[in-house]
């Protein structure tokens, strides 16, 4: 999964390096998704201030994920929108969810008329913002496009302070949001942070694989080193966020990995837990 792809020119760059998914940062203005932009600080050796207007970026993503367009790339099957809503209260987050649904419906799904086919994950930075998901889902239903929810998954990634939520707290937030299935969970550190023991990641994977697990897929960020990618795969992640997709492709082709792992294709179900 290509990390921090926020400018239109970066899309083909990451795809040419082998990415089959892209992660974008969505910055809001008055609860309206306005820019794809991360800002400083960010991962080491990256340009933190690349950006585009959200509607332009969404329309461009449609061209890369809709058969028939010159830009179409069959490999691009998943889009992760990292929603920068951390400073919003729950009511504001609901409005942000409504507006995100409207903009994706218009600019990416083209009002469900030959729209982009990629799966979408909404990554929300705070478990207290469960109303964002409700607003998003209810808007698509109200607009008559409930079917598009089949293509959408959800991730609560925080908050990080004063501590990360427990898995039970995260599960409760999904219940409040009315989400059962289509659950992704992210874990990780910036690419310049010490790796650590991956304790939370291992706990999440154990929960995913349990009989009553609520998580469908787990992805880890930001993985730029061969050694880190190898450790993440051995632990059992479903996805890897990276600034260097070619490095991950190389690891997937190594002995010990190439017989167990491969890049996902459009025919794979992103909401199905592997191995269950």
From Swiss-Prot:
Annotated signal peptide: none
GO CC annotation terms, alphabetical: extracellular region
Known tissue expression: Expressed by the venom gland.
Residues noted as binding Mg(2+) in the record, renumbered to the chain: 23, 25, 82
Active site: 3, 38 (nucleophile)
Gene3D superfamilies with a match to the protein in the record: Phosphatidylinositol (PI) phosphodiesterase
Domain of life: Eukaryota
Cofactor: Mg(2+)
A biological-process GO annotation: lipid catabolic process
Function: Dermonecrotic toxins cleave the phosphodiester linkage between the phosphate and headgroup of certain phospholipids (sphingolipid and lysolipid substrates), forming an alcohol (often choline) and a cyclic phosphate. This toxin acts on sphingomyelin (SM). It may also act on ceramide phosphoethanolamine (CPE), lysophosphatidylcholine (LPC) and lysophosphatidylethanolamine (LPE), but not on lysophosphatidylserine (LPS), and lysophosphatidylglycerol (LPG). It acts by transphosphatidylation, releasing exclusively cyclic phosphate products as second products.
Stated name of the protein: Dermonecrotic toxin Ls4SicTox-alphaIII1i
């Amino acid at each position: 999964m290509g990390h921090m792809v926020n400018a239109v020119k970066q899309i083909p760059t990451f795809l040419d390096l082998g990415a089959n998914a892209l992660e974008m940062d969505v910055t809001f203005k008055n609860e309206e998704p306005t820019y794809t932009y991360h800002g400083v600080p960010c991962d080491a050796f990256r340009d933190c201030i690349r950006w585009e207007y959200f509607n332009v970026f969404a329309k461009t993503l449609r061209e890369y994920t809709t058969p028939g367009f010159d830009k179409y790339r069959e490999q691009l099957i998943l889009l992760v929108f990292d929603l920068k809503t951390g400073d919003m209260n729950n009511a504001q987050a609901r409005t942000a969810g409504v507006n995100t649904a409207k903009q994706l419906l218009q600019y990416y799904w083209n009002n469900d008329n030959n729209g982009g086919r990629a799966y979408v994950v909404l990554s929300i930075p705070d478990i207290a913002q469960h109303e964002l998901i409700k607003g998003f889902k209810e808007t698509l239903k109200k607009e008559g496009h409930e079917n598009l929810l089949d293509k959408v998954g959800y991730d609560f990634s925080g908050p990080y302070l004063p501590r990360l939520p427990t898995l039970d707290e995260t599960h409760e937030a999904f219940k409040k949001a009315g989400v059962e299935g289509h659950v992704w969970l992210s874990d990780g550190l910036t690419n310049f942070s010490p790796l650590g023991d991956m304790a939370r990641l291992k706990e999440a994977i154990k929960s995913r694989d349990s009989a009553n697990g609520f998580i469908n897929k787990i992805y880890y960020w930001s993985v730029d080193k061969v050694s880190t990618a190898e450790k993440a795969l051995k632990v059992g992640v479903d996805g890897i966020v990276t600034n260097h997709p070619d490095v991950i492709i190389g690891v997937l082709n190594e002995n010990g990995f190439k017989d167990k792992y491969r890049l996902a294709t459009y025919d794979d179900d992103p909401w199905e837990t592997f191995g269950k």
